A protein has these predicted regions:
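Surface-exposed intrinsically disordered loops and tails
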Residues: 1-9, 123-129, 176-193
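Aromatic (Trp/Tyr) and acidic
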Residues: 1-41
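Low-complexity, acidic Ser/Thr/Pro/Gly-rich terminal tails and inter-domain linkers that flank the onset
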Residues: 39-72, 101-103, 111, 117-119
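Hydrophobic residues positioned within well-ordered beta-strands of beta-sheet architectures
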Residues: 61, 73-77, 95, 148, ...
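Short, ordered beta-strand-loop transition motifs
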Residues: 64-74, 138-147
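Short beta-strand elements of extracellular/lumenal beta-sandwich folds
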Residues: 69-101
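A surface/secretory-pathway sequence property marking extracellular, secreted
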Residues: 102-157, 164
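Terminal connector regions
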Residues: 139-214
Length: 214
């Protein structure tokens, strides 16, 4: 600060800021001196600094239901990269939304009667990096479990990326739709308010990184 205690908080204003840097360094030095000359017999705080964990939870997915009915589920999926040992951009990230078509099979329908549409892709809109969304794939044919893969693997991501998709069931032979999201694995515990979920598993370089598969 100048003689009138005026300060410009701008890195390029060296005259105003270098003294602040020197002050911070001097304060640390003074504390070290106090400990050296007057700290005989003093003990450091046990378990300080506290352990902050590792990166096991650094990449995860969150879900938010936008629409649910007997025709479709519309869901926003957000992938988070919050790695911090060290913070780093990562490529190779994918996620899977698992769902069941058991209710459709009761009306002689199969996976070919389910389509997926993308309604919003933050990667494409904000960064020009379109997310790849697969067609519905079979996971367990006997149990009618399928999934859609959301693929950001070609891009380096830190922070988060959001995408909104819809799973849509065609009408059956009775001219009605019979979609039921309540038996869908990845629908578990997600509501109209975004929340982190283990039921939308996340993969790194093709290997399961976080979450639970059916």
């Amino acid at each position: 600060p100048d003689d009138n205690d005026y300060h410009v908080d701008d890195t390029n204003e060296y005259v105003y800021n270098e003294v602040a840097i020197d002050y911070n360094a001097g304060l640390v030095g003074a504390l070290a001196g106090l400990y050296r000359y007057y700290g005989d017999g003093e003990q450091g705080i046990e378990d300080f600094p506290p352990y902050e964990g590792n990166n096991d939870e650094g990449i995860y997915a969150a879900g938010k239901i936008e629409q649910d009915n007997d025709q479709r589920t519309q869901v926003t999926i957000t992938i988070y990269n919050e790695t911090f040992f060290p913070p780093q951009y990562l490529s190779g990230i994918t996620a899977r939304y698992f769902f069941s078509i058991e209710e459709l099979s009761d009306y002689s329908q199969d996976i070919s009667n389910v389509t997926v549409e993308v309604y919003y892709d933050e990667g494409d809109s904000a960064y020009g990096e379109a997310t790849t969304v697969s067609d519905p794939q079979v996971w367990n044919e006997d149990e009618g479990i399928c999934y859609v893969e959301i693929d950001w693997s070609a891009f380096e991501i830190y922070g988060n990326r959001e995408i909104q998709i819809a799973l849509i069931a065609e009408q059956a032979g009775d001219y009605a739709s019979h979609w039921d999201p309540n038996n869908d694995w990845s629908h578990t515990d997600i509501t109209s308010t975004e929340s982190a979920t283990e039921y939308i598993p996340v993969y790194l370089d093709g290997d399961l990184y976080n979450g639970i598969e059916p």
